[in-house]
Amino acid sequence: MSKVRWKAVRPLRHRDYRLLWIGLAVALLGSGLWLVALAWQVIELGGGPVQLSVVTTAYSIGLVVCVLFGGIAADRLSQRTVIVAADTVRGAVLLVVAALALTGWLEIWHLAAGAVIIGAGEAFLIPAYTALVPRLLPADELLAANGLEGTLRPLAQQATGPALGGVAIAALSPGVAILVAALTYLFSAACVLAMHVRPEPAAPAKADDDAPTGVRSMIADLREGWTYVRQTRWLLASLLFGTIFVLLILGPLEVLLPFAVRDQLGGDAREFGLILAAFGIGGAAGALLISSRKLPRRYLTVMTLMWGIGSAPFVLLGIAEDLWLMAAGAAVVGATGSAAMVIWGTLLQRRVPDHLRGRISSLDFFVSLLLMPVSMALAGPAGSLFGVTAVFAVAGIGPVIVCLFVVWLGRMPSDEIAHPLDQDEGATNLISAEA
């Protein structure tokens, strides 16, 4: 058992990766703090679901608009420099927001403006982080590194960070929580600055004079990736489901959940933080459970049904009047969603050709984000017009219906039988990839 545990944390023996991982852990705590502080700061300013919807939509717009540029920057610049710049900008913006909050000058539009920049910073950071990790670790430790991050993200960003944010807000104020979040981003930047990694040499230019360059080259690459998606039925169906899934659940989760906690439970930031913590703990448990087992034989069907049917407890979030019942529903959604993501990541690694994997991953991220602003923008008005209970009912029932349609549309049962994945390889196992 001790050997198994050692393999799971083996990437942390590398100094540069350890610094990057510590910085990520602290920054994710800050993101969790910011998530709770943002919601309660809007409420303290007298805002409701519509105002919170405006602010969260601003964040998603910054993310969506900049994500493709972030990918280009990660390929053309030093990833270390991009990460440091993104974290420094995010920290500086939150320092300004915290100062405005603590001095009583903060307004809703300040939060919206800050959210746009926070989203843009994240759009640059994520692809740079993804591109940097393989330069820090040997290939046989990348799977374990992904497992470490997959466990860390829900525990820090969705569990510990929100819980700490709820306590800080209840004891002090949202402004103090925002200040702490700002410091976490600056700490992360300092960790990455302390790394010794050097930029890779630039790739030699192609001799083919007819090869597209600049913007034409980027368009050609994106077109090739999109052509592959259109011709790969299971992949196209999965991306279609992901787009609708985000539209149905993200707005209610990000915009309406704080008001469900306040109105149904009579709760405050502490209860809200506990519900988000339940999402995170469930997510970590789901990721660990699915990654410690062999890939399911019906991997496409299992993945899609976990996303769809696993969202049914969203109905509970709109009707529960007991904290633990709401937390249990959140934990189930978190567990099934994270487990499905582990399978999805494995499929991108094993069924997408090597020369297309980066572009397909980028398209996946972009398509997943595409309707995020729409979901955020609609959630507040829909909650005011139809009620929070009705919106959460749609968020719970809608994905169930859509996932059944997508399994049929993508011909997933026949596809997964026609393309079996080696069960002995243990692609989703965090510890068995090394010889």
Indicate residue ranges for each PLM-predicted region.
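Alpha-helical transmembrane-bundle signature of multi-pass membrane transport and export proteins
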Residues: 1-435
